[in-house]
Amino acid sequence: MKKLILTALFATGVVAGIEAAPTDSVTQADLQAIIQRLNKLEAENKAQAKKIAELEGKNKELVAKQSATEKKVETVAVAKSEDSGKIATDKDTEVSESGRIYTAKGRKYYLADATAKIFEPLSESGLRITPYGYLVFEGVYSTRPLDCDWSADFVKPRKGKTNNTTLSMQDSILGVQFDTPEAVGGWTFTGRAEFDLAGGDQNSYDFHWRHLYVNAEHESGWSILFGQTWHLWKMVTPSEIDGAWMENAGHPYRRSPQLRVTKKWDWEDSSLEARVGIVKGGPGMGGDRDDDGVQDNSASTWALVEGALVYDRDAPWQDKNDGLQDGRWLLGIGGQYGNDRSHRYTETGFDGQEDEYKSMMGMIAASVPIWHFTLKGQFYAGQNLGGVQAGCGQRVSYNTFGGRGNEVRTIGGFIDLGYKLNDTWSFAAGWGCDDPIDSDVEGSLAGVDGILYNDRFYIDAFYQITSNFKLGLEYARLMTSYAEASGRAGGDYDADRVQFSAYYDF
């Protein structure tokens, strides 16, 4: 349109000039020059129009990229209702009274973050990076010496009472979760890098890797994970505050390098997850009982083969609109089977021939919500489980010099009852035990600590001050039973333990 107007105006001016000029002065050469000038102007107009079109195209691309970036950041439109004063959000999000938003994928952030668009930043490659973690201050008092000052598995076999106190920050966790916002051929990729500050005592804040893995998940329900994370059979967790987390008292667990394949079937109100994988080496995987510098699980050509089958379903008796009620129940089975290798014990130490030892376990676990309560627990049985915090930390017992060792068999489990009173107060109580077979432990020359039984009872109270700051208080009663051995009297040793914790979650 602009070209037509300019051409018309110019032509009108030319015609007017021609009409005003004397007729005898207009020659064929003049007409030819005018035509050439018009053609030149038309070409210039076409070039200008092409340039304008290119600029408009680039502008559209910039607008599209900006829109895509805004979608990746997952901004949430928030408005306050004039009538009810409630916060309105996009579909599939929930907002607590504190202003924290819970998305459909379970992520959480604040309205201020959504407005400023500063949460979950995207890297240049399109990777979404989410820092997380918590800082925790812990104060502990115990009536007897325990095996560790800031967390505890066992009561030490000492006569008399010696009170102990300690302060620490070692249970603090720092981590980064990363994922690709968009699927590639139906696959999405997530990962995690997480560490804590667990060290030898309350002043030793050594970095300790907890999780370090990548998980590729397909829209069909298949996923492949490689890296270090929980063993495949881990399904439920006690509510205990102590950083020992009921290890060697009914709650086996470990995080170790692995390759796992998972298939999940999702239905309208339930799901079924099948896990299978191999676990090799890593922290605590059999340890190094012969002290040859190689972990016993790594010394064997066999890896641990692990698996689990977990079914969970909506609990129809629960009120889904009550934010204080857990709405799903869970039932699962799992286990492991594999070998480790170590030298036999002789009169001069672990320098005898090498042997392979079986490590195996079967487990059943469940979690059931009942109104504001949640009842959960597990039971397991197996042998040579010291590497996964069971069998009271005992793996293989050597009863004769130069003879083959015996795998320590054990059974155990825990039960935990949690209660959520309101958004501020919650409580829990639980008990667990680990009970090795006495004959596998008694009379041992090496390889075990002579622990015949270990249990723990605890009561917890939590007070949520803000959405990311809470306090916790725990009383625990610990009891460890020892076999009689050279330089140590057998018997039961108990202790009372009180822990105060302050958590800052981010």
Q: For each predicted feature, which ranges?
A:
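Outer membrane beta-barrel
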Residues: 116-151, 155-284, 299-314, 323, ...
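Transmembrane beta-strand segments that form the barrel wall of outer-membrane beta-barrel proteins
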Residues: 188-199, 226, 276-280, 332-339, ...
